[in-house]
Structure formats: C-alpha cells, structure tokens
Amino acid sequence: MTIVNLAAYHFVSLDANEQWRPLVTARCNELGLRGTILLAPEGINLFIAGTREATDAFIAYIRHDPLFEGKFATLQFKESLSDSQPFRRMLVRLKREIITMKKPAIKPELGRAPFVDARTLKSWLDRGHDDTGRPVVMLDTRNAFEVDVGTFDNALDYRIDKFSEFPEVIDANRADLEGKTVVSFCTGGIRCEKAAIHMKEIGIDNVYQLEGGILKYFEEVGGAHYHGDCFVFDYRTALNPQLQPTENVTCFACRAVVTPEAQRSPSYVAGKSCPACAQAASAA
C-alpha cells in the first residue's frame, strides 16, 4: 500500500488550542492517520501519514472546517510517498512554540520574513550574487549532525546542537553577514523562517528565507549547488536531491546518522552500535 506523507507548518496567532486538541485528535483517528501535530500560540506544525483518501480528507478538514475560523485556509503541504507507515501513533500536542528557539513567541501579524523561491535562489548562486549585485551567503540553521549529511556549497554552519542556540551564535557572528544577502535554510522551512524573522528583528539587513526549505528546492531545481543528501526526521533518515530515500541509516543506540561508508566499519553493528558510539566510548 502506498502511504502519503504530509508535512506543513504555518505561523499564525492561535488562542483556542486546548479546545481544538481533542477534536483534531478524534478526526485524525477517524481517518486512520498517524503522526504528530503541534499547536502553539504562534501557529501549527505537523507531520502525518496515511492513505491518499485519508490525507486528502484531512487537508479539506484543516483548511475549511468552521472550527478553525479560516486560520489554516492557506496552509501549504509538502508531500512524499512511502511503502509503509513511518509513524507509530497519532499525537496532537500543545507547545509554547512550534519550533523551540527559547525566545518570546513571534507575532505573525507583524509579517513574515521575505522569502526567495528555489529557482530565483539557483540563479543567484549560478551568478554568485543577487539581482542587485550583492554577494549571497547561505546560512544553515539546522543542527550539526544534519548538516553533516548534506548542505549547500560554502554554507555557513555554526555547529549548533539545537535550534535554541541559534540566537546566540548569530549575535557572535554578525560580521559574517554584514554587507551580504543572507539566505537562511533548513529542511522544510520552519526553522529558516523563524531564524529569518529573528535576524530581521535584531536589525540584520537583507535577510531572506528559502521558501519551502531544502526539500522544496530539491523538488523545484534538484541538487544544484548542494552536496550530499538531506536529513529527515523519520525512518527514511535522508533523502537525495531526487527526493528518494538513501542508504543512510540512524544508529539505534546513539541516534547518529550512519553513512554507507560508516556501515562498512567493524564498529557498526546493525541495531546495536556505530562508529560514533565507538568513538564516544573510547573518549570516555
């Protein structure tokens, strides 16, 4: 059976999440969906999967049901297919933020950060500058272990372990961004959107977010100016620029990404350990 995987997020002020939670949970269970939906005062973030019929019904529900007062009428979904269900259960959770930065929740009504679409970004990278002649710098907002799987050529990577470290590293490295057009990017768009909004709020000029993140870029223009694969937070571990699962796996013990090369190491035992485990053990 073909399973449809949906991912979506939207920054919008919400104040009825406690009332919505049981109703959304019940509807998802009726449709046989699995995955996670996060609701927070700043918006919604979701990863769900099910049959085509079920996911189509969910999209219609979340966009058009009067319960939501049109808050999600423009919610855009990213879709991929798999041969099996990647999630074990259905959860609807209430959170302080839909992506944790440990900063006061943003106010979506004040306006999102400017975005650049995949084709425009590719043309900038082809030329080495934006349409005004300003040099372009790519800023990776993901965690270090994700970056190691793949990233844009010459991207800035501050080796953060969690997204809440982003404001601090930006404050410490503002000089890297001055006089340039900064394009923040992440897997699907949510972190780079919040990162771009934060940079805009602290006075960094000429900041854009990559619309739809790396996965949308792959969908639109392939792997141009990108090396490696894109880590994803499900059983597939990583997708290549053709949006196909790769041979990368996640270590059962330490959750590190294990490349095909690392899987040939004597330290790799499927379901038990990997070279990263061995290195950590030897350093202890």
UniProtKB/Swiss-Prot annotation:
Cross-referenced CDD domains: RHOD_YceA
Assigned EC number: 1.14.-.-
Class of the enzyme per the UniProt entry, highest EC level: oxidoreductase
UniProt-listed Pfam families: Rhodanese, UPF0176_N
One GO term (biological process): tRNA modification
SMART domains: RHOD (SM00450)
All residue ranges annotated as the Rhodanese domain in the record: 132-226
Physiological role: Catalyzes oxygen-dependent 5-hydroxyuridine (ho5U) modification at position 34 in tRNAs.
HAMAP family linked to this entry: TrhO
Family: Belongs to the TrhO family.
Protein name (database record): tRNA uridine(34) hydroxylase
Lineage per the UniProt record: Bacteria, Pseudomonadati, Pseudomonadota, Betaproteobacteria, Burkholderiales
Gene: trhO
